[in-house]
Amino acid sequence: MQIILLDKVVNLGNLGEIVKVKDGYARNFLIPTGRARRATEAAKAEFEAKRAELEKAAAEKLAAAQAQGEKLAGTTVKLTQKAGVDGRLFGSVTNHDIAEELNKQGYNVVKSQVRLPNGPIKVVGDNTVTVALHTDVAVEVTVSVYGETA
């Protein structure tokens, strides 16, 4: 299926590009989330009419994400979990916990934006986590996990 991208999609293309994707990917993900439209002649004409408006909106989103990224860069998140003597946690620290703590600190972050490269954190110590605010803006945040003995 050929589609027109209404937003930048990682590993697929940028705003305004006409790309060919599998039908299921288009029907079940790209079109329902508003990232693409079917590439019919009417849709192409409508897109060209709205192109400047969509590019301006995309630039505003990028600028807002960059501004938030500058504030968020270098932030340290401190979390306390119950841990054993050897430093292993009884449970784990997930992207939900990190996003919740960042929201308490005043940053507007959704759990899907927090990227844990090695899965949930299961040991006490400092870890570096990536927060993807936009497809072009990713910020490194330090997560310090402290153990609390039972």
UniProtKB/Swiss-Prot annotation:
A matching Pfam family: Ribosomal_L9_N
MF terms (GO), sorted A to Z: rRNA binding; structural constituent of ribosome
Keyword terms: Ribonucleoprotein, Ribosomal protein, RNA-binding, rRNA-binding
Superkingdom of the organism of origin: Bacteria
Biological process annotations from GO: translation
Record keyword Thylakoid present: no
Family per record: Belongs to the bacterial ribosomal protein bL9 family.
Known function: Binds to the 23S rRNA.
Protein name per the record: Large ribosomal subunit protein bL9
Gene: rplI
